Every structure is written in structure tokens, then in C-alpha cells.
Regions:
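Acidic, glycine-rich flexible loop segments
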Residues: 144-179
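Terminal leader/tail segments of proteins
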Residues: 83, 95-99, 166, 197, ...
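Mid-length scaffold segments of soluble, non-membrane domains
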Residues: 91-157
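C-terminal motif of bacterial Sec signal peptides marking the signal peptidase cleavage site
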Residues: 24-28
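Short, basic, low-complexity termini and linkers enriched in Ser/Thr/Gly/Pro
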Residues: 2-15, 19-20, 212-219
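N-terminal secretory signal peptides
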Residues: 43-116
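Extended, aromatic/histidine-rich regions of cofactor-dependent oxidoreductases associated
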Residues: 31-34, 151-153, 170, 177-219
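Short, low-complexity, disordered segments immediately C-terminal to signal peptides
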Residues: 32-45
Length: 219
């Protein structure tokens, strides 16, 4: 026997008001002024300064005390708003566990969350986002990558980006926030290496970089 679920009809006036509010919100979002480049530069500069302060005196600093004078403040490429770009996540149906080699010789287990497709300086590109098997926070998307600066201007073991998973599938990738794995500062950290699929065939001159040519030798 089938049952029919009767739901009360939404009154006309509240429904009309709801439609008006949603339309107004959509219009406001569409007409939102673009971010002022000066504000963006200030935001990234403040984020970098906060990292330096935390790494210098924070109780959980990854930089050993005997290397702080050498490494701090951290080295960065100049802030470039063109390295912040919109990306679309194409979810992955692949549930296979992928072993990631690490800096300590161990293996970390990852799964593909999907491919982030974007355009950077006019060139279409793609990076795979991963989630770690057994991680307490599956909302964190992990994007380790190499590019043509790896090993010369940046750490040979790649750089990292993180994103918080959302329901829209639309993200902002900001390479000005790309950072070195902690094993660059201290070999006590275990850092996964980027997989072959995340090796960009362009130089990404944004985010963290070596301070001097000698810094890359002390990994």
C-alpha cells in the first residue's frame, strides 16, 4: 500500500518575499566589486608576517632554533595577484589507495579527491587534490606539486597547497600561499613527495622560495 505525504502549501506572500530576497542576494553577489589588488597584497603580506612570527617564537615551530637566524624571515617570490586563480574540482571516482613516498623513506596512503582544473597566466592546467587515508579531517584537500623552479629556486621536494572542501566544487588556488614542506627546515619531519601527475611543466614564481642559493643545500 502506498502512502501519499501531504505537505502544507507555502503561503503565497512568504514565498514571494523569499524569492525577492534570493534575487536581491544574487544581484548583490553578481555586482560585487572586484578585490582591490592593494588589499590583496596587504592580506598576503600579513599572512607571511604571521608565519614568520609563529616560526620564530611559536611553541610548535618547525624551524629548529639553530636554523632560525638563517631561514627567518622566510624567502618568498614577490606577491603577484595573477597567481591567484579560480579552479573547478572534477571529483574522482577512483577509490584506489595511492602510496606516496616520503622524505623519511616511509609511505603515506592517499586517495584522489579529484582534479582541479584552472588557467594560470593564460595556460590551462590541472592539479590533483588528495585526502590522506585515515586522516581526521577529510575536508582538507592536499595538493603537493612540483614545477620548473623545483630544485633551483624552490625546494626540490616540491611545495604544498591546502584547500577546504566545499559543496560548490568551485575553488580559488592561490600560489602566493604555496609553502615548503616542513622537512626542508628539519629532517625530523615526514613529507610526502608530489606524484608525477602534479608536476607542472611551467615555472611557478609565486609563494615560498629559497632565500639564497646556499639554502637549498641544507635540506
Amino acid at each position: 500500500m502506498k502512502y501519499k505525504l501531504d505537505l502544507p502549501a507555502l503561503p503565497v506572500l512568504p514565498a514571494l518575499l523569499l524569492a525577492i530576497v534570493l534575487t536581491a542576494c544574487a544581484a548583490a553577489c553578481a555586482n560585487k566589486p572586484p578585490e582591490d589588488p592593494k588589499d590583496y597584497v596587504s592580506t598576503i603580506a600579513a599572512w607571511r608576517a604571521a608565519r614568520d612570527a609563529d616560526f620564530k617564537s611559536g611553541s610548535n615551530s618547525p624551524v629548529p632554533e639553530n636554523r632560525r637566524a638563517e631561514l627567518l624571515p622566510l624567502g618568498y617570490f614577490p606577491i603577484d595577484p595573477e597567481y591567484k586563480t579560480a579552479a573547478t574540482l572534477k571529483p574522482s571516482d577512483d577509490t584506489a589507495v595511492i602510496p606516496f613516498a616520503t622524505s623519511t623513506g616511509t609511505v603515506r596512503q592517499m586517495r584522489r579527491a579529484g582534479a582541479l582544473e584552472f588557467t594560470l597566466k593564460g595556460q590551462p592546467l590541472k592539479l590533483t587534490a588528495f585526502v590522506e587515508v585515515g586522516a581526521p579531517n577529510n575536508d582538507r584537500l592536499f595538493m603537493p606539486f612540483n614545477d620548473l623552479t623545483s630544485g633551483t629556486e624552490t625546494y626540490p621536494g616540491g611545495r604544498y597547497l591546502d584547500l577546504e572542501r566545499n559543496v560548490t566544487g568551485i575553488y580559488e588556488i592561490d600560489f602566493n600561499r604555496a609553502y615548503f614542506p616542513y622537512c626542508y627546515y628539519s629532517p625530523t619531519y615526514e613529507c610526502p613527495y608530489p606524484p608525477a601527475e602534479n608536476r607542472l611543466k611551467i615555472p611557478v614564481r609565486a609563494g615560498e622560495r629559497f632565500k639564497t642559493e646556499n639554502s637549498k643545500l641544507k635540506t
